[in-house]
C-alpha cells in the first residue's frame, strides 16, 4: 500500500524497450567476431602466412647454397646442385604470400579465390616432391664421395672408386685446384642441402595439409543442430 506504483503504460513501454535494445547484442557480436579473428591469427599474422614466410626463407637458402655448390666445379651436374628446388619453392612462397596477404578467406566465395588456393596446394605438393628429390640426390652424392679416393690433377680433381667395386669409375671435377674443396667443402654443402630440403619439404607438407583442412574440414554442425534441437524442444512442450 505504501509503495509507489508506476502507471501501466510506463511499465509496458519499459518492457517493450528491453527486447528491442540492440546495444548488448551488437557488443556481443563484435566480441565474438574479434575472438574468431584472433583465433585465426598468430602474433598478428595468419598461420598459413607464417608457412609461406618459412617457404620463402628456406627457398632462398636452398638457392644460395645451390649456386655456391655450382661455383666449386664447372663439371657438376644439375642434380648435384639443387638450386632449382629453391627456385620452385620461392615461386610457391610468393604465390602464398600474395594469396594470404591480399584476399584469403577460409570459405571460397569467388572462382579466383578457389583457383589461387588450388594452385597453391598443387605447387606446394610439387615443392614437396622436388625437395624429396633434392634430398635423395644429395644423399647419393654424399655417400659416393665417402668412398672415393681423390688425387690432384692439372686444373682438375680425379676421384676413383676402390678397385674392389664391380663398377669402378673415375670422376673428374674440373676447374678445381685442390681436392679438399670436393672432399671437404662440397661435402658440407651436401649435408646443408639435405637438412634444408628436408625442412622445406616438411613445411610444404604442412602447407598442403592446412589448405586441405580449410577446404574440407571446416564444418558448422553445431550451429546447424542447435536451432533444430530448439525447435524440437518447442514442439515437445506444445
Swiss-Prot record:
Q: How does it sit in the membrane?
A: Multi-pass membrane protein
Q: Which InterPro entries match?
A: CD20-like, Sarcospan
Q: Which residues does the entry place in the Extracellular compartment? A: 1-48, 139-188
* Any Pfam family: CD20
User: Keywords for this entry?
Assistant: Cell membrane, Membrane, Postsynaptic cell membrane, Synapse, Transmembrane, Transmembrane helix
Does the keyword field hold Transmembrane? yes
Q: Which domain of life is it from?
A: Eukaryota
Subcellular compartments: Cell membrane; Cell membrane, Sarcolemma; Postsynaptic cell membrane
- The residues exposed to the Cytoplasmic compartment are 70-81, 103-117, 210-238
Q: Say if the entry is tagged with keyword Transmembrane.
A: yes
Q: Per the record, GO CC terms?
A: dystrophin-associated glycoprotein complex; postsynaptic membrane; sarcolemma
**Physiological role:** Component of the dystrophin-glycoprotein complex (DGC), a complex that spans the muscle plasma membrane and forms a link between the F-actin cytoskeleton and the extracellular matrix. Preferentially associates with the sarcoglycan subcomplex of the DGC.
Q: What is this protein called?
A: Sarcospan
Originating species: Oryctolagus cuniculus
Organism lineage string: Eukaryota, Metazoa, Chordata, Craniata, Vertebrata
Amino acid at each position: 500500500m505504501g509503495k509507489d506504483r508506476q502507471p501501466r503504460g510506463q511499465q509496458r513501454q519499459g518492457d517493450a524497450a528491453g527486447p528491442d535494445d540492440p546495444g548488448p547484442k551488437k557488443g556481443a557480436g563484435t566480441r565474438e567476431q574479434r575472438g574468431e579473428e584472433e583465433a585465426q591469427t598468430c602474433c598478428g599474422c595468419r598461420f598459413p602466412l607464417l608457412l609461406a614466410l618459412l617457404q620463402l626463407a628456406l627457398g632462398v637458402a636452398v638457392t644460395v647454397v645451390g649456386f655456391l655448390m655450382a661455383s666449386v666445379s664447372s663439371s657438376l651436374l644439375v642434380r648435384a646442385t639443387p638450386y632449382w628446388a629453391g627456385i620452385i619453392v620461392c615461386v610457391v612462397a610468393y604465390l602464398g604470400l600474395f594469396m594470404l596477404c591480399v584476399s584469403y578467406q577460409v570459405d571460397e566465395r569467388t572462382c579466383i579465390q578457389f583457383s589461387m588456393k588450388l594452385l597453391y596446394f598443387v605447387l606446394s605438393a610439387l615443392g614437396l616432391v622436388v625437395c624429396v628429390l633434392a634430398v635423395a640426390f644429395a644423399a647419393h652424392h654424399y655417400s659416393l664421395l665417402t668412398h672415393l679416393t681423390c688425387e690432384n690433377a692439372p686444373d682438375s680433381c680425379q676421384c676413383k672408386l676402390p678397385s674392389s667395386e664391380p663398377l669402378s669409375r673415375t670422376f673428374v671435377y674440373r676447374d678445381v685446384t685442390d681436392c679438399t674443396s670436393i672432399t671437404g667443402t662440397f661435402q658440407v654443402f651436401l649435408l646443408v642441402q639435405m637438412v634444408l630440403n628436408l625442412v622445406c619439404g616438411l613445411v610444404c607438407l604442412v602447407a598442403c595439409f592446412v589448405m586441405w583442412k580449410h577446404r574440407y574440414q571446416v564444418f558448422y554442425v553445431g550451429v546447424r543442430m542447435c536451432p533444430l534441437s530448439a525447435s524440437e524442444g518447442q514442439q515437445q512442450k506444445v
